[in-house]
């Protein structure tokens, strides 16, 4: 069951209290492109986080190791989601697969201790804001919300499109300019009343305006931006899913282009070479693609997988979340921070 990040100016969290709608972008263009040679020098992302210098993309069949301290206790099944790394700490959402999908935000420190930070949170995907707070895609109130990590207070950013609540906001990517791109499938729609007539990918401008990026992907899930912020990636579609790329010009997403077929896609991460790390939930693996959609590597885990983020001292540790578990693997390339 698939369930399902860039700096966010503080102003957007205090201003985006209402939203209006725009028409969806044009349908995807399915033309192919000839993949160029894989780069070996890391680019610098839009926020300046990627280090310059040599980098090596993963290749072949790899396996991530489970972080035992993060294992969920025996009992009701749980799903970990939306990992973000900051100041030596991994934060992620942890929700129960039961009525209402009750959720909390967990903190996994460098000392290996797992602590509950905020409960309840109603959260799924997470992103780090400029002021150190967390931006969360939530299903309890069907909104994007801002959480203060010190006092746990919550503030709505946006919660509806054309007068109706979202379905169950799932994952997001935040541009250096403060634009939020997020997916709205129906996986946790039953957590609260109301919803949309379709599942969609949305854009939230810095002025609070909500517009549709794509409504042709069934249950869009993972979403990420290229290091330079000029391409948006979205994965969704279930068993016969798709990884789709959209050029961003003047802050708006253009027609999408299908890069690869993916099975039960969930969350994503991007490295500083621009490679795309797409999880395949019930396939219990992550696949690494170059920006043209050519597969470079697979990373296996031992349970259903949901999402991914880079962290660690040099940002070369890939952390993976899934069914009551967190995994990690060291790579030869740093990640583009979300």
Show which residues each predicted segment covers.
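Bacterial N-terminal signal peptides that target proteins for export
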Residues: 1-9
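C-terminal motif of bacterial Sec signal peptides marking the signal peptidase cleavage site
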Residues: 17-19
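Sequence-structural signature of mature extracellular/luminal beta-sheet repeat domains
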Residues: 21-24, 30, 35-338
């Amino acid at each position: 069951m698939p369930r399902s990040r860039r700096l966010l100016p503080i102003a957007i969290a205090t201003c985006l209290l209402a939203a209006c709608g725009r028409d969806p972008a044009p349908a995807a263009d399915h033309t192919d492109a000839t993949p160029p040679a894989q780069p070996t020098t890391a680019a610098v992302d839009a926020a300046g986080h990627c280090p310059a210098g040599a980098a090596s993309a993963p290749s072949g069949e790899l396996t991530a190791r489970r972080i035992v301290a993060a294992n969920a206790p025996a009992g009701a099944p749980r799903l970990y989601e939306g990992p973000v790394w900051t100041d030596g700490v991994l934060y992620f959402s942890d929700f129960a697969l039961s009525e209402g999908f009750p959720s909390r935000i967990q903190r996994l420190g460098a000392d290996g201790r797992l602590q509950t930070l905020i409960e309840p949170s109603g959260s799924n995907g997470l992103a780090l804001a400029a002021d150190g707070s967390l931006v969360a895609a939530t299903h309890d109130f069907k909104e994007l919300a801002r959480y203060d990590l010190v006092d746990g207070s919550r503030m709505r950013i946006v919660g509806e499109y054309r007068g109706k609540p979202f379905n169950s906001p799932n994952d997001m990517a935040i541009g250096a300019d403060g634009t939020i791109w997020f997916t709205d499938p129906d996986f946790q729609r039953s957590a609260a009343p109301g919803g949309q007539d379709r599942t969609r990918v949305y854009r939230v401008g810095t002025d609070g305006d909500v517009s549709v990026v794509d409504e042709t992907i069934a249950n869009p899930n993972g979403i990420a931006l290229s290091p330079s912020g000029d391409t948006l990636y979205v994965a969704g579609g279930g068993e016969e899913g798709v990884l789709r790329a959209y050029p961003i010009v003047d802050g708006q997403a253009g027609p999408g282009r299908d890069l690869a077929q993916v099975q039960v896609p969930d969350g994503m991460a991007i490295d500083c070479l621009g490679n795309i790390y797409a999880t395949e939930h019930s396939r219990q693996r992550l696949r690494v693609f170059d920006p043209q959609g050519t597969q470079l590597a697979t990373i296996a885990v031992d349970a259903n997988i949901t999402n991914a983020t880079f962290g660690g001292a040099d940002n070369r540790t890939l952390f993976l979340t899934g069914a009551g578990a967190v995994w990690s693997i060291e790579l030869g390339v740093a990640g583009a921070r979300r």
